[in-house]
């Protein structure tokens, strides 16, 4: 079956479903790397992607945002001039109650009320003020970091804002 739209999983109610030792068949998160670029660089500013609303971000959306930001930064500023880090981890296991999806299926299957469902993926729960992604750059690459995070935010299902913080004393805030 195809993947359901993100709107089915964006909002949440109730506690997170995270106990993997009791859940058989949880798929692995699609996020390949959580830290990219030059880890040991000397940077001036830290740009953060901060969430405005509470919700859930699926692991494939986090991976799409990571790929978009990393590709833009590596092509514009070079691999040695930035450090990109994903700050959230998709712990919450998403479930889906599989239903028949073809013509006339409504006559064959009513479905059970409040059916539990099988694990289909994972999501990260975020709240207002949660930092999802951070980019560290030098002063001359600040505009590229802003554009990379703007592109990454377009891949996420919730609204976000970009905040810059100076890493060294004496630098003025942006």
UniProtKB/Swiss-Prot annotation:
One Pfam family this sequence matches: Ribosomal_L16
Gene Ontology CC terms: ribonucleoprotein complex; ribosome
Molecular function in Gene Ontology: structural constituent of ribosome
Keywords: Ribonucleoprotein, Ribosomal protein
GO BP, one annotated term: translation
Signal sequence annotation: none
Source domain of life: Archaea
Family the UniProt entry places it in: Belongs to the universal ribosomal protein uL16 family.
Full protein name: Large ribosomal subunit protein uL16
Organism classification: Archaea, Thermoproteota, Thermoprotei, Desulfurococcales, Desulfurococcaceae
Annotated gene: rpl10e
